[in-house]
Amino acid sequence: MIVGVLVAAATPIISSASATPANIAGMVVFIDPGHNGANDASIGRQVPTGRGGTKNCQASGTSTNSGYPEHTFTWETGLRLRAALNALGVRTALSRGNDNALGPCVDERANMANALRPNAIVSLHADGGPASGRGFHVNYSAPPLNAIQAGPSVQFARIMRDQLQASGIPKANYIGQDGLYGRSDLAGLNLAQYPSILVELGNMKNPADSALMESAEGRQKYANALVRGVAGFLATQGQAR
């Protein structure tokens, strides 16, 4: 699998994510499965935050209590999302090409995304919060650093929030507000020049969330909700570039 290369399905086949808008074929989505399949000391290298500071190149991520890692969850869910979008005629690219090696730093991922001039950028993650905390939250850059972050990115976050909730995935009860969280510390969002969100799909330390994440059926449920959110946003963006 080649990182950053646009891929589209040869024969569009509508996935289980039904009622998807029909005018999104040819649009471009950059998918960032958060974290790396492997890590070493290089992930501590300092890179720009997009707000004048620096932060680590990458974080190692979290895991469920049984040891299922965040990086594998985001990878497997990201592949499902990619397949569903390709089946709808959407062109996609991934930030990393495998789940067993070092991946690009957070600023490099943002630069890769911006270079594609995508209609949407979605970064997939899972939180490591308190065991009592359950549910997803959708992050966006705040305060915004450009007009895209101020408008379309927030719209994207709200549409994704609504579709996740409509799919039966609960909003976070321990962080953010009403399933949304405006943040200034996420480099990928700060550096984005195109509509961009980071979705924490659930809390890996919560028994109910982790059970969903650890099952293939659960990952498909997340992917189906994600494709509805992405497609719903794309439908508001006019024609493909």
UniProtKB/Swiss-Prot annotation:
One of its GO terms (cellular component) is outer membrane-bounded periplasmic space. Residues 45-69 are annotated as: Disordered. Zn(2+) binds at residues 35, 70, 125. Residues 29-230 form the MurNAc-LAA domain. Residues 55-67 have a biased composition (Polar residues). Residues 1-24 form the signal peptide. The active site is at 200 (proton donor/acceptor). Its EC number is 3.5.1.28. Its cofactor is Zn(2+). The keyword Cell division does not apply. One of its GO terms (biological process) is peptidoglycan catabolic process. SMART domains: Ami_3. It is found in: Periplasm. It is an enzyme of class 3 (hydrolase). Belongs to the N-acetylmuramoyl-L-alanine amidase 3 family. Cell-wall hydrolase that hydrolyzes the amide bond between N-acetylmuramic acid and L-alanine in cell-wall glycopeptides. Is able to hydrolyze the cell walls of several bacterial species (i.e. Paenibacillus sp., B.avium, E.coli DH5alpha, E.aerogenes, L.acidophilus, B.thuringiensis, B.pumilus, B.subtilis and E.coli W3110), thereby showing that it is a cell-wall hydrolase with broad-spectrum activity. May have a role in peptidoglycan fragment recycling. Monomer. This is N-acetylmuramoyl-L-alanine amidase Rv3717. It comes from Mycobacterium tuberculosis (strain ATCC 25618 / H37Rv).
